Amino acid sequence: MSLVVDQLSKSYGHQVAVDHISFHLKQGQVVGFLGPNGAGKSTTLKMMAGYLASDSGTIQLNGIPVHQNSIEAKKIIGYLPESNALYEQLYVKEYLQFLSSVHRIENVSQRITQLIEQTGLGLMQHKKIGTLSKGYKQRLGIAAAIIHQPKLVLLDEPTSGLDPNQLIEIRALIQSLSKEAIILFSTHILQEVTAICDRVLVLHQGKLVADEPISELLQKHNTNLEEIFKLLTH
């Protein structure tokens, strides 16, 4: 499984949000998409997920053009947006059953049981979504993104606003997903990248200013990631 992004661009009027970025990802990697607020991370993820058209450039997932064949591509893409709207009046298990029908999943009961165990939602499955903590809502959002067992998982700020214990649990969950898929998650929190990522993409003012394994980036600049980030985004 591979993802190839080539010369991807997007503007809003005269404002360039994403400026001809290119990169190549493969299965088994947890890749951090790092950049300050407004760098273009969310716009890029929306285009990769097939929810926003690009102005130019291409996105191919295992040879499938995402925008020219969005229905087929979305079958193997999971996406958790930064502002994830959940049906708060539904029960957790009820919501997952609804999503199973949307994705036409076979063996629904088996898949939901597996997913609840994988995401640590066992004690919450019979509770209303509106009563869940921020951490459990994020778990449910991730469960919703991976219910159809996608090969590309895009997570937009999945650890934002979580307490330290929730952070550890969500990090472990994200890492576990990389066994079966390409994982790309955006963040502006440097500790998240160093904690769980193999590789980092750094976006600044819509341009890709770094794309390499974290170990090589640290070795090249001979300093910590915080100083490297300041250097790349100023």
Where do the PLM segments sit?
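Conserved ABC transporter NBD signature motif
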Residues: 57-68, 72-73
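Conserved ABC ATPase "signature" region
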Residues: 97, 101-124
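Catalytic Walker B motif of ABC-type/P-loop ATPase nucleotide-binding domains
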Residues: 153-157
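Helical segment within the ABC ATPase nucleotide-binding domain
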Residues: 167-179
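A short, surface-exposed alpha-helical micro-motif characterized by mixed small hydrophobic
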Residues: 193-195
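ABC ATPase "signature
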Residues: 211-212
